[in-house]
């Protein structure tokens, strides 16, 4: 019996734009972290993604709560899952890095403030961020993906379309 050949992995240059389009359309992601005992915790967050043509980087404007900080100190890997009612889903597995320097926080603030609808929004609407990007309760979380999956709902519902998966 002959072995089936491994399917060719699509290039990041094919998967990343499809991922960004779907993620920015869906907007909200379930983001999972793991504590020091290996127990997962999820929360709903609002990432924004930048595709340079060579590199995909995600950013989350978030409060650096003690729980998030402890989880990411213990294990800096996060899993993001997006879903919409048409069953379009996309996932990103990433290394997360806290960014507390003022230049990065201002840049991420501006990414959201000037981002296209529906992913863009004014971060100043969050009461604890009233002091702007230098607020103690505002941090930038950088996401560097090592795996992406884009799964159009049409694949599930009608058997049409293509699932795209990339990993580093």
What are these regions (language model features)?
Residues 48-87:
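A short mixed-secondary-structure module that forms the rim of ligand-binding clefts
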Residues 27, 43, 76, 136:
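Short beta-strand or tight-loop elements
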